[in-house]
Structures are given as structure tokens and as C-alpha cells.
Amino acid sequence: MGDGPSEMIMLMTGLIVAGLVSTVLLSTWDTMSQGLENQGDLEIKDAKTRASLVSDPSAISWDNTDDRATIFIQNSGTISLSIDDICVLLDGNTMSVTPIDAAGVTWSKGVAIKFQIESSTDLTFTDGTEVFLTVGVSSLSTSPTGTYSLTEVIRLDV
């Protein structure tokens, strides 16, 4: 007869523990589900963010005196890109990037923008030098922001 109350206490304890465990599991699942959803949104934005070099890669004019060149990059994706958020590497060197005649322009699908790329260090190339040009762009929209980078071998015309 004395076992009834202790069994009832054990049953209640088991139910409370089971309730706490299920709450933790549901909370964890919700967090994981939200993370997967955010990752999916990011992948969609990345897939819609694209850019292409439309300058002739076999004849990019390079100025050894001013350490600069002019390139044309086209938005070949389906969403608008940020003109001010572009990164360019030339032969592994970070370049400063300035859009030319792009004031008030929305860098939407199909639009090509002229950029001047300039090195802060002395880069001297000979005519016909082949180097890697890497361009990174990001979407104009945020939360999440789509990103894309392209790398091409270009020949410098000095």
C-alpha cells in the first residue's frame, strides 16, 4: 500500500522531465529550421547575382605610369548589383575601383558599367603580360546579400 504515493511521484517526475525535454527539442528544431531557411534564401540570392567582364580580355589597356586600367563589367544576373561594393584583384593585388559616368545609374540586369581600376603600389607590366583578373560583386538588396566572383586570364596591352 505504501508504493502508491511513491509511484505517483515518480510518474509526475517523469512527465515533467518529458515535458522539459520536448520543449528543448522543439526549440532546437525551430532554430535549425530557421537557419536552413536563411541559408536557402542566401543560396537563391547568390544564384541570381552574376557579373561578366565585357571588355576584350585579350587587350586590356594598362597604364604603367599611373598603374591603372579601365574595364567594363556587365550585370549578367537577374537582380540589381551595388556599384559601390565591388572588389577587383589584378595579379593578386587589390585595386581601388572607381565607377566612371555611373552617377544615378542602377546596375540592373544587362547594364554594363565602366570602372577604372588603380593600384596603390607600383605595378609594372610588359606588353602582352597575362595576369588573373578577379572581380567580386554583391547584390543591392540586403538580408541576405547575394555575392558572386569571377576570375579571368587577361592580356595587358601596355
Enumerate the predicted regions with their spans.
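N-terminal export/assembly leader peptides and their processing motifs that target proteins to secretory
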Residues: 28-158
